[in-house]
Design a protein with these regions (language model features):
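Conserved C-terminal guanine-recognition region of P-loop GTPase G domains, centered on the G4
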Residues: 125-135
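NTP-binding/hydrolysis catalytic cores, primarily Walker-type P-loop NTPases
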Residues: 196-234
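Single conserved hydrophobic/aromatic residue that forms the stacking wall/gate
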Residues: 1-12
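P-loop/Walker-type NTP enzyme "switch/lid" segment
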Residues: 13-84
Length: 234
């Protein structure tokens, strides 16, 4: 959500395939409801549209198995094309259909959390994709990148260093940027408060973006996929 909103333009589309939660689609619904209740948000959305002359990026619901099919159907119906589509997929390969969807991606970015269960699951997921899809060259995938999410700043350097060594030994690739564990990532638009950080309609408030790790992550992801860093002021 933050990646798409931070780099929002008409080249982006968000596809919410995290069945059954569909958390991104639900967030868009909350955003729209809160805009209708908050005059400041209405003005902000209007000024944003006047400035960039583009609507908010679309969000559609889908199942992991049907994500690519639904994307093409959407583009055919709307007569639109997109340079970038962000898929919000569950971190599991539950069925053959999910594997086909994952194989159709260009890049996969896997968030990591320094928890043994989460790490074992994430690394196993990534290793399977590397060995069964990328290494065999029978898919569209160009690469998989891991990145640290919810990093504890209170001092667990030894733990992160140990996991980094494991990742290196497994031959997996880790982004240098990371996202700290901070409450600002929970700050959505609401009817009474200002200073939005997480939203499907607005980019993060610049005052809260400092030390969030988000600009660095966006820049590194853009470099990885061969995209010039977006103008986040648009």
């Amino acid at each position: 959500t933050l990646l798409a909103s931070s780099a929002a333009s008409d080249v982006y589309k968000r596809q919410d395939c995290d069945y059954p939660q569909h958390s991104i689609a639900l967030m868009r619904e909350r955003d729209m409801e809160n805009v209708m209740k908050n005059d400041d948000l209405k003005v902000s959305l209007y000024r944003q549209h006047e400035r960039i002359r583009k609507p908010a990026y679309p969000v559609i619901k889908s199942d992991p198995e049907k994500a690519v099919e639904d994307l093409h159907r959407y583009m055919d119906e709307k007569g639109e094309t997109f340079d970038i589509v962000l898929f919000d997929l569950p971190g599991t390969l539950r069925s053959e259909g999910v594997v086909h969807t994952v194989a159709a991606m260009d890049y996969i970015f896997v968030p990591l959390k320094a928890d043994n269960i989460v790490m074992q699951s994430s690394l196993q997921f990534t290793k399977v994709l590397e060995e069964e899809l990328i290494a065999k060259g029978n898919c569209n995938l160009k690469g998989i990148r891991l990145f640290w999410n919810m990093v504890d700043r209170r001092g667990r350097k030894n733990l992160y260093d140990a996991w980094n060594r494991v990742i290196h030994r497994m031959g997996l690739r880790l982004l240098s940027s990371h996202i700290p564990n901070t409450l600002r990532y929970n700050k959505e638009a609401d009817p009474v408060c200002k200073g939005v950080f997480r939203s499907t309609l607005f980019p993060p408030d610049p005052r809260q973006e400092k030390d969030s790790g988000l600009p660095e992550l966006v820049e590194e992801i853009c470099r990885t996929i061969g995209l010039e860093e977006p103008d986040t002021d648009r």
